[in-house]
Swiss-Prot record:
Protein name listed in UniProt: Aspartyl/glutamyl-tRNA(Asn/Gln) amidotransferase subunit B
Gene: gatB
A GO molecular function held by the record: glutaminyl-tRNA synthase (glutamine-hydrolyzing) activity
Organism: Carboxydothermus hydrogenoformans (strain ATCC BAA-161 / DSM 6008 / Z-2901)
EC number: 6.3.5.-
UniProt KW NAD keyword: no
Family as reported in the entry's similarity comment: Belongs to the GatB/GatE family. GatB subfamily.
Pfam name, any one: GatB_N
GO annotation, biological process: glutaminyl-tRNAGln biosynthesis via transamidation; translation
């Protein structure tokens, strides 16, 4: 069998977080009643004219700068003509030969190596409506159309065909999502459709420079789905070529339930859309002053923030990576770390405990019931010896479920650590007397028996005993027996 490699390019649609649509004043709010956010403009009724929302251009420029693109001084809109039930005008206002930006890139890390993925272009366009099907698409008796999404502003980010594996595709999309979220121009919620990804994929024998025949894959609504769909499609294409077959250029749909791609329609070429300049919109001229005004609003982006976390807080690259996955998480960590002397300890609690609790509860960091300063207060109780490490986890979980301050929880539940040697000595004596076999085992060289006895003491004190003091006291007493 010949060795093949995949050639993958991604087309990512990002819904911009503006209050109104790209060419009219209708709301962009998600989740309204079907066809409640519509007007004659977004429904394409006769006699209406589009008016460009300047905020859309601002946000598109911001994305282009964050992705290292060259922003055009002059760009225009075009009509993309096609017929589909979710497109009321029978054309989409998009950009064709003069897009807003081109020649950008982002970098991903693959097996410890940095790889640069080119971005061919970024252009602005309006979204289409949404078809709602009853049950399975293959057997549904009818489809309904919700036009609320029609005219919602999008940018389409087109990668160069630099991606070679499904894993690289997933890493690219994860990085792109993080960068866009950091800029604040979109919430990038894949489950709500505000970040959508189509993949173009072909395979070729290793060493061959010419591209193979590509297919386009749609309907991938998660990072995992993207990777799985590409893995399946690459294997499907290789199998066809190995059997002497020919790849058909077509659009395919990822079927999540069956974990396969299914043919939808033949793939269109650009000339099929009969692009021509949009006659109802003037070209957009972007001068240097406008560009620099937007550049000044760019936040610290994920890579720069990750590097600073390593240098400023002494974090490992991995911990810095986890904490900078979203802007909100990075902000939360910094707020907690600034009030405490040991930023590494804060990172450990946020990554190992807080994220675990958030995941279990299905919550985002923005919904976190623990305030950043409460983590600092709890760590200070730990440093003072007021609570033990084990009790700290109990307190932390209670903070998460109740939102109360750690001092209040410790007082209410009587969780102050026992450090009084007299009190500890009485418990140690009681446990030694109650467990003669474990004592004998320890004296015979079985070190595990000591752990058992420590566990019994912690159980007796409900975890409030100071572990170091218990260990030392127990060893001293056992040595005298």
């Amino acid at each position: 069998m010949r060795e093949y490699e995949a050639v993958i390019g991604l087309e990512v649609h990002v819904e911009l977080k503006t209050n109104t649509k790209i060419f009219c004043n209708c709301s962009t709010e998600f989740g309204g009643d079907p066809n409640s956010h519509v007007c004659p403009v977004c429904l394409g009724l006769p006699g209406v004219l589009p008016v460009l929302n300047k905020k859309v251009v601002d946000y598109a420029i911001k994305a282009a700068l964050a992705l290292n693109c060259e922003v055009a001084e002059y760009c225009k809109f075009d009509r993309k003509n096609y017929y589909y039930p979710d497109l009321p005008k029978n054309y989409q206002i998009s950009q064709y030969d003069l897009p807003l930006a081109k020649n950008g890139y982002l970098e991903i890390e693959v097996d410890g190596q940095v790889k640069r993925i080119g971005i061919t272009r970024i252009h602005m366009e309006e979204d289409a409506g949404k078809l709602v099907h009853q049950g399975n698409l293959a057997v549904t008796p009818y489809s309904l159309v919700d036009y609320n999404r029609t005219g919602v502003p999008l940018i389409e980010i087109v990668s160069a065909p630099d991606i070679r594996t499904p894993e690289e595709a997933r890493l690219y999309l994860e990085k792109l999502k993080a960068i866009i979220q950091y800029t604040g121009i979109s919430d990038c919620r894949m489950e709500e459709g505000s970040l959508r990804c189509d993949a173009n994929v072909s395979v070729r024998p290793k060493g061959q420079k010419e591209f193979g025949t590509k297919t386009e894959i749609k309907n991938m609504n998660s990072f995992k789905a993207l990777q799985k769909a590409l893995e399946y499609e690459i294997a499907r294409q290789i199998e066809i070529l190995e059997e002497g077959g020919r790849i058909i250029q077509e659009t395919r749909m990822w079927d999540e339930s069956r974990q396969v791609t299914l043919s939808m329609r033949s793939k269109e070429e650009a000339h099929d859309y009969r692009y021509f300049p949009e006659p109802d919109l003037p070209p957009v001229v972007i001068d240097r002053e406008w560009l620099e005004e937007i550049r000044a609003t760019l936040p610290e982006l994920p890579d720069a923030r990750k590097k600073r976390f390593v240098e400023q807080y002494g974090l490992t690259p991995y911990d810095a990576h986890v904490l900078t996955l979203t802007r909100e998480l990075a902000d939360y960590y910094e707020e907690a770390a600034k009030g405490y002397s040991n930023p590494k300890a804060v990172a450990n609690w946020v990554i190992n405990e807080l994220l675990r609790l958030l995941n279990a509860a299905g919550k985002e960091i923005t919904e976190c019931p623990i305030k950043p300063e409460q983590i600092t207060k709890m760590l200070e109780l730990l440093d003072k010896g007021t609570i033990s490490g084990k009790i700290a986890k109990t307190v932390f979980e209670e903070m998460f479920s109740s939102g109360k301050d750690p001092e209040v929880i410790v007082k209410e539940k009587g969780l102050v650590q026992i450090t009084d040697l007299g009190e500890l000595e009485a418990v140690v004596d009681k446990v030694i007397a109650a467990n003669p076999k474990a004592v004998e085992d320890y004296k015979n060289g079985k070190e595990k028996a000591l752990g058992f006895l420590v566990g019994q003491i912690m159980k007796e004190t409900r975890g409030r005993a100071n572990p170091e003091a218990v260990n030392q006291l127990l060893r001293d007493k056992l040595a005298k027996l």
